[in-house]
Amino acid sequence: MKSGRFIGVMSGTSLDGVDVVLATIDEHRVAQLASLSWPIPVSLKQAVLDICQGQQLTLSQFGQLDTQLGRLFADAVKALLKEQNLQARDIVAIGCHGQTVWHEPTGVAPHTLQIGDNNQIVARTGITVVGDFRRRDIALGGQGAPLVPAFHHALLAHPTERRMVLNIGGIANLSLLIPGQPVGGYDTGPGNMLMDAWIWRQAGKPYDKDAEWARAGKVILPLLQNMLSDPYFSQPAPKSTGREYFNYGWLERHLRHFPGVDPRDVQATLAELTAVTISEQVLLSGGCERLMVCGGGSRNPLLMARLAALLPGTEVTTTDAVGISGDDMEALAFAWLAWRTLAGLPGNLPSVTGASQETVLGAIFPANS
């Protein structure tokens, strides 16, 4: 069974940077050693946003974007190696999630698409890469997401305490770690995605730092109720979603009914949308004693305060409190999934994704020996 140093690479739907994590992994433990966040050039970020919202590209443009993202991921890995004074031979493999540009797990031909050419990463780093983690699960009838609950269960499940892990990235997803029950998990809806899109359009800021804008505004209750009527929120699990659904166009359609509103009030309403949709799903799933939050949203003081207020009797904390950086959780999970793939172990949980069976995930892109 392969063990040793692995690197996880994650570029999520929030597009706030490429997260790279170095960890030692074996069958008994996952020990994080180092991490860094690598910036995404504005031009690449905009290209990804455009394609996620349905803008048409030529095949040439699409191929260029795939290559550019692969090179970006390789640069991020090389920066971490240099920082840690490590060589390619010191790393067993890289687990690279890729950049999701479309996720459509239902319909006549279910599919999901993550780009960022893994061949570029292998060629530029000299390290074996495991990628394309989601499509095997979809081929077996699953949603292909979320995949991280399996990792949450391995690291954070408790024999007696009802726990849930909440990742608030661009999309928010919940892992249900309830003693005596199969692991559950699904996307609750927008996390930071709509908040980030709104403040970017209104103020040119990538995100609402310390929720300053949201805290300066007031929740527009009719707008909140209008958004909460979206059918996704009442859809039963398993379910997953992404930027192809909850995007700026989605927000604009709801705002048409509310002309002339204060932009800060919209920001406050979007924060409340995220908090309410998450808390409702926690309660519908039977509640928990401890809700451990990770992802960029765990650094949003307003979101954390609202979750605590909406979930009385639940200890709302970050995963930092149990020794795992909330900023690095997803990248660490894909390092772990790469280890499982090389070990020939399944990486999905049918109780979460709805797949017909457990399966080894991903494709292996071997480095030259």
Swiss-Prot record:
Pathway: Amino-sugar metabolism; 1,6-anhydro-N-acetylmuramate degradation; Cell wall biogenesis; peptidoglycan recycling. It catalyses: 1,6-anhydro-N-acetyl-beta-muramate + ATP + H2O = N-acetyl-D-muramate 6-phosphate + ADP + H(+). Gene3D superfamilies: 3.30.420.40. Pfam families: AnmK. Its EC number is 2.7.1.170. It is an enzyme of class 2 (transferase). This is Anhydro-N-acetylmuramic acid kinase. It comes from Escherichia coli O157:H7. The lineage of its organism: Bacteria, Pseudomonadati, Pseudomonadota, Gammaproteobacteria, Enterobacterales.
